[in-house]
């Protein structure tokens, strides 16, 4: 999935400077292959800790905005990134929820530390509340490619039902997951 996300962002004609927070060898190679800056996370602080670390790096460098994209949204498309930037306020945020409305699958903030990001189960409502509490505009966009994150077996079936041939879809089809039994779901 990470490969699909990084490749989609790299192919985006309006791509700004991009960073990948990781110390994973496979992810490091992808970052190099697609010319992403690497922000090492040797302590592996988890998603929220990695984003806080990257936010601090951006503040130190005087970066104007951040767009945080997770690695588990293989259907992301450049047109959706265009929509985020088209709606981005001069000061404020844009949030794109997961399809179930519980998780946050894209978070644009200007300035970069406008409000803290806290990922995990049910992150969307807290992110929306934090964004609104700043008094700055907060735009919520429903973006179908970004909305489908893969958190559980049911999401794999949803991914397979979409047209297209991302690397992830191709791999799932090779694995022939049509017989996979879905017994429950986890949080986004």
Question: Residue spans of the language-model regions?
Answer:
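Short, high-confidence coil segments that cap the C-terminus of an alpha-helix
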Residues: 15, 63, 89-93
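A short, N-terminal amphipathic alpha-helix
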Residues: 1-15
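Short phosphate-binding loop-to-helix
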Residues: 32-65
């Amino acid at each position: 999935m990470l490969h699909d996300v990084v490749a989609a962002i790299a192919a985006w004609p309006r791509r700004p400077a991009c960073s990948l927070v990781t110390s994973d060898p496979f992810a490091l190679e992808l970052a190099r292959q697609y010319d992403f800056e690497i922000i090492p996370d040797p302590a592996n602080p988890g998603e929220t800790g990695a984003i806080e670390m990257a936010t601090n790096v951006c503040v130190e460098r005087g970066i104007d905005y951040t767009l945080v994209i997770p690695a588990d949204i293989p259907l992301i498309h450049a047109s959706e990134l265009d929509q985020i930037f088209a709606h981005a306020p001069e000061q404020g945020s844009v949030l794109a929820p997961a399809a179930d409305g519980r998780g946050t699958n894209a978070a644009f903030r200007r300035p970069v530390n406008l409000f803290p990001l806290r990922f995990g189960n049910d992150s969307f409502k807290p992110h929306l509340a934090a964004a609104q509490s700043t008094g700055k505009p907060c735009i919520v966009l429903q973006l179908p490619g970004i909305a489908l994150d893969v958190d559980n077996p049911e999401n794999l079936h949803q991914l397979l039902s979409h047209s297209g041939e991302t690397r992830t879809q191709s791999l799932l089809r090779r694995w022939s997951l049509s017989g996979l039994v879905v017994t429950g779901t986890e949080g986004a």
